[in-house]
Amino acid sequence: MATRGRPGAKQVADHSVSDGGEQRRIPQKPPGPERCDVCSAVSAAGAAADLIDVAPLEEDLTKEPQQIVVTIMSNDPAKVCLKVDPALHYRNVELEPYRFLGRGGYGSVFYSRRANVAVKALTHGASFRWELAVSLIVSSAARRQELSDIAKHFLQIYAFSSVEKIIVMEYIRHDLRTYLDEHCKPVTQSALDALVREFRGLAKALAFFHIECGLAHLDVKQNNILVNCDPRTGDPVRMVLADFSLAAINGNSFLNKCCMVCPGRPGVTGVHIIDTEDAVNSLPSNNILLFRMSRRPPEFLLDYCNGVGPRCGEVMGAMTTFAMDVFALGSVVHEVLLLCLSRVLGRDPFPHMTCTDEPMDHKTILSLLAYRLALTDYLSQSWSSAGFVNPAGTREGISSALQWECMRDMFLASAEAWTRTVRRKMNGARSPSMFADILDLSILLCHFDPDVRRTVSALA
């Protein structure tokens, strides 16, 4: 359904009128953007103050102008200032008509048919500035020749409006969940090969995100992975990691030592995007870390069961956050593997454990660990040629890592029950050889040992 008003119009409009049954917003004069001493405010009117069209980017992004320039603060040599290209900043974004794509906890996304771009309108100023900063950092990486293979897994930023809290970015047609609903029917070898290639690329992109950028995603799931596919075959040709609403700094970050500004230009006032305190404020709360615990790695779940829960406001190491997000990516690969196997076998031979996104109690967490152990051990021993030893851990290893006897007893009982369930449900089912690579990749990404998980960044 097309949306006629600008995505951010609700933030500058105070009334609407009806025209033939259709609501048409009458925007009032928008409030001026926040002035910043670091930015040069330019008030002269300019024809380019409003975004009415988007020029396509060069295929070779290294020929595009730099989006961010790094400068040392003259009054504080220990602090860095990231200056954003003023040409990206617009007073208003006018790319109608729009088609609504989806809504999340922090804003909504629309598709501009005229410009063939995605337009994300965020609700709050703080979330807008933070997501813009993270998006610009990873988008700017595409301008470095040596990172061209990494850059394809992130969205390119075309423009933004600080008044309307809007970010204009590349449009990718599907998220992974929608792609799987519409494609891979039937499952082909070429589709599986393409999925493995793109998932490996996403793992390397996560390594760059965590280690080079000092950022953790913390919400890797099917809905946050976007897919472009070959129009003829339906095979995925590009997968992109999207939505940095929950992104946080880790121990490798430089954002807690810098600010990001966008200088002014004719018709558009300069803005202060983030400062050091914004990076510190991005540290994940306990609620975020305990959200979707089913995607958290075993070391995180074991610590939680032992009473060593996440420490709110603490900066985690880059290798710790990388292992966490890689496991979440592995969970996505595992979901894709089981879905595609079910389609090829003509039935769903796998037992499933349903988990909510809400924090779990200890009994559910221990049952989840037991389920992972039973299913992954069966798959690796019966189907995989990867040669990993105990990829999901062992009963003894997990049991010995639990401090309290009642927890150990609960886990061992769940492990025995899940092992019987897996064997009975699988009933001798065998995987076709076409699934060997995606199975091995899922085992690696979900490996019990975080050090093994992290080796994925070195994959060819």
From Swiss-Prot:
Gene: UL13
PROSITE patterns: PROTEIN_KINASE_DOM (PS50011), PROTEIN_KINASE_ST (PS00108)
Keywords from the named record: ATP-binding, Host nucleus, Kinase, Nucleotide-binding, Serine/threonine-protein kinase, Transferase, Virion, Virion tegument
Locations listed in the record: Virion tegument; Host nucleus
InterPro entries noted in UniProt: Kinase-like_dom_sf (IPR011009), Prot_kinase_dom (IPR000719), Ser/Thr_kinase_AS (IPR008271)
Post-translational modification: Autophosphorylated.
Active site: D219
Compositionally biased residues, Basic and acidic residues: 12-25
Organism: Psittacid herpesvirus 1 (isolate Amazon parrot/-/97-0001/1997) (PsHV-1)
GO MF annotation terms: ATP binding; protein serine kinase activity; protein serine/threonine kinase activity
Protein name according to UniProt: Serine/threonine-protein kinase UL13
Source organism phylogeny: Viruses, Duplodnaviria, Heunggongvirae, Peploviricota, Herviviricetes
Other noteworthy facts: Displays a substrate specificity similar to host CDC2.
